[in-house]
Amino acid sequence: MHIQSLQQSPSFAVELHQAASGRLGQIEARQVATPSEAQQLAQRQDAPKGEGLLARLGAALVRPFVAIMDWLGKLLGSHARTGPQPSQDAQPAVMSSAVVFKQMVLQQALPMTLKGLDKASELATLTPEGLAREHSRLASGDGALRSLSTALAGIRAGSQVEESRIQAGRLLERSIGGIALQQWGTTGGAASQLVLDASPELRREITDQLHQVMSEVALLRQAVESEVSRVSADKALADGLVKRFGADAEKYLGRQPGGIHSDAEVMALGLYTGIHYADLNRALRQGQELDAGQKLIDQGMSAAFEKSGQAEQVVKTFRGTRGGDAFNAVEEGKVGHDDGYLSTSLNPGVARSFGQGTISTVFGRSGIDVSGISNYKNEKEILYNKETDMRVLLSASDEQGVTRRVLEEAALGEQSGHSQGLLDALDLASKPERSGEVQEQDVRLRMRGLDLA
């Protein structure tokens, strides 16, 4: 089982190579391209009996990322590789994506960046004399400057938190004596020459700038520590989901490449949209104790909603139920909530297919679009968190006895809802009246086009 927890920039390997380029002691180090013939010869091997093309491709894809992992671990002082290893019997759906392998490596690399920041701590008290005397040591091997630039590159590529990635990138580009910080992590370049030629005043200015950088690094470190802690908890949850649901959970991995949600969250959302939504919601709505599997799904979904931000604009979705729902007893203008998760759809046709008792039009901003994870992509599902407060703007029965309801997420406030004419802006087509037909339904349904049927 391979768990992806972080979504990263594809330039990670390049950045790490750049962080390590320069000189090794007195020897200049450069990248030398390996001849293609040698590469082919090195990669040639007899495939074990029964090993198919997909498995061999998977092993080839993961090899460079494992090599990066080894290199980074040695640089930052970690001698034991605990990262995921390619499995002989891994499922092709999981093992065939280079993106997944990269994310697995970055997941393991992020904790290592904390060790790099530890090694850089001496920069906070570095003196101008120490800079002149120790620059070669600081900028090579596991020296403070080298470790800092490498750790920041790892955070920029490996953090799942956008603010941390941005801050790490800004620090790498910070001008130290007129030279970007990331260039101070090598010897033999412009930074080395500057230290040799600098006046005592300029060296003091450089160390003052490094002191300021380290004060900002301390704040960044706190954010990374918090993220690493969350990653550890997420891995435990992901392992629990896989242990409980097996392949039914694993099949959802990789369904949200580049998304904000972790493996555990994606698996939990996927399992919910599959066959587990009914039992989980029934237990939540009836106040029953959740079983072990339901607790895992609920935990993962709750984490997903905590991480998700609100949409920039109000989203209109539709919901249908075969009977009543949690808002039956809520009067117009009042606020209520569903104790379970609230599934809605961007497609009104989906609401009609479910709606033999109640059809609702829902306006909100906090829903999660799970269509990319769900097996039923045509449902275009937007999922709201359990106990999301909704204000009932309209509730009336049509001539078929179906309750038509308009819900507005209560958190939107007065300026986003009915006071701005939201009801009148509904664009759902209503059926034309036939001559002589008695209209029993609430006149507001016809005026505002709320007839979905």
UniProtKB/Swiss-Prot annotation:
Cystine bridges: none
Annotated site residue numbers, Arginine finger: 146
Lineage: Bacteria, Pseudomonadati, Pseudomonadota, Gammaproteobacteria, Pseudomonadales
Active-site residues, as the UniProt record annotates them: 319, 343, 381
GO MF annotation list: GTPase activator activity; NAD+-protein-arginine ADP-ribosyltransferase activity; nucleotidyltransferase activity; toxin activity
TR mART core domain ranges (all copies): 239-414
Keywords: Glycosyltransferase, GTPase activation, Nucleotidyltransferase, Secreted, Toxin, Transferase, Virulence
Predominant subcellular localization, coarse grouping: secreted
InterPro entries, alphabetized: ADP-ribosyltransferase, ADP-ribosyltransferase_ARG, YopE-like, YopE_GAP_dom, YopE_GAP_dom_sf
Domain of life: Bacteria
Compartments in which it is found: Secreted
SUPFAM superfamilies referenced in this protein's UniProt entry, alphabetically: ADP-ribosylation, Bacterial GAP domain
EC number: 2.4.2.31
Protein's UniProt name: Secreted exoenzyme S
An annotated GO cellular component: extracellular region
Catalysed reactions, semicolon-separated: L-arginyl-[protein] + NAD(+) = N(omega)-(ADP-D-ribosyl)-L-arginyl-[protein] + nicotinamide + H(+)
Effect on the protein of changing residue 146 to K: Complete loss of ability to activate the GTPase activity of host RhoA
Role: Bifunctional effector protein that is secreted and delivered by the type III secretion system into eukaryotic target cells. ADP-ribosylates several eukaryotic proteins including ezrin/radixin/moesin (ERM), cyclophilin A and several members of the Ras superfamily. Host Ras ADP-ribosylation blocks its activation by its guanine nucleotide exchange factor, thereby interfering with Ras-mediated signal transduction.
Residues in Bacterial Rho-GAP domain copies: 96-229
